[in-house]
């Protein structure tokens, strides 16, 4: 198994350990809780007397939301986002946002980021480095709550 630099891989991520040598995760990738990365499909092995194996390649700067399932034989292109709860059954191209079961391309990453930037101009927003779990003090928690009350 190859895991690049600056990869956020939570402990709850399920990795297909017997065939983990078929998994490659490049730099700057992130996963939400409870994701699964599968390199084999033994569902019909009783009937087929065989199992499907396939590489999983996750290119640089990809991010998968909570509960994403990545099936054997797929590549997720660089700079792509996958929505929470998605099932990746085929390749995801570079620079897109994909979601669903099976996952389909929703829009380009640039379109998504433009929409998010516009939202940040009108909604309360907070500098991530101050409010991530490592730096979230009681005072910052209280400030967040007060800012988000309506």
Question: What spans do the regions from the language model cover?
Answer:
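C-terminal segments of enzyme domains that contribute to small-molecule binding surfaces
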Residues: 51-64, 69, 103-150
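Short-chain dehydrogenase/reductase
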Residues: 63, 81, 97-98
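Residue-level recognition of short, solvent-exposed, well-ordered loop/turn junctions
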Residues: 2-4, 57-59, 77, 93
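Acidic, glycine-centered active-site loop in nucleotide-sugar glycosyltransferases
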Residues: 93-94, 99-102
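Extended, small-residue-rich solenoid/repeat segments and analogous flexible loops
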Residues: 1-8, 12
